[in-house]
Amino acid sequence: MRVSRRSTSIAAAALVVVLLGALAALVGSSSSQASPKASNATFLAALVSDIGKFNDRSFNQSQLEGLKRAQRLLHVKIKPLQSNTTSDYIPNFSTAIRAKSNITIAAGFLLADTLETVADKFPKSKFAITDYCAKGATKCITGSVLKKNHKNVMGIDYAANQSGCLVGYLAAEMAKKQGGKQVIGAVGGLHIPPVDIWIAGYQFCAKLYNKNITVLIGYSGDFVAADKCKTVAENQLAQGAQVLFQVAGGCGLGTLTAAAQAGKWGIGVDKDQYKDAKRVLSLIHI
């Protein structure tokens, strides 16, 4: 039984909106503007993944699906560039620039330093980065701000604390239904702002539902290796966790596996991860 299941189209649709916003803000500022219909056929949008790769069934994959949806709906050209290691970051950005991409999107926090270097070197190229804010932004939810004020870079920030809040409230309710001591857990990847804000919202609203609930929080230090998240999750299960929430990309699939093997509920992130564990309680990505 699942309480709710959101399809992957939610994440994809969100990325389409992000892409549209990026196009309007970055490309629309160009002095020579063609009509949308005339320009779409030649418009090239590139996406550089982090080391989680496009098959992480989470963060990177959801962005790729959003890009592909933009291709279908907006009829733009796309260029996904997968990073297998951090040494691929610079070459992938270079490939996008050589291909004359109209906008190159960096998939998240781990690419920030590289993006800043590239943006400085290629001031005429347009970039965007998810889970980050441009320097001088009037509002930045995650608190992750680029070091320099790049006129050619757009930051894309999410209210992940609100999504985390909904998940925390739901987890607390499910724990209550199971009876006994109320314990839930959260397994993060790296201890970075985009992850911390998810977990902060999760903990806050779990406590809002039940002030006496115990919320266990752990980090794997990784976004890729599922066994590392599985180890953290198993430790939380041993402490009585009744529901586990993962915020760790592909690594977090290990959290869902551990929960399923223990007969407990797991909560996925970024994409519908029900098929990966069969005990996923809900997916919420807003």
Question: What are these model-derived regions, one by one?
Answer:
Residues 74-83, 210-223:
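Short beta-strand elements in bilobed, periplasmic/extracellular small-molecule ligand-binding domains
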Residues 101-109, 126-130, 240-249, 267-269:
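Periplasmic-binding protein-like
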Residues 67, 164-213, 217:
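An alpha-beta-alpha
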Residues 40, 45-70, 79-89, 109-111, ...:
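Extracytoplasmic "Venus flytrap"
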Residues 123-157, 270-278:
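Flexible loop/hinge segments that line or gate small-molecule binding clefts
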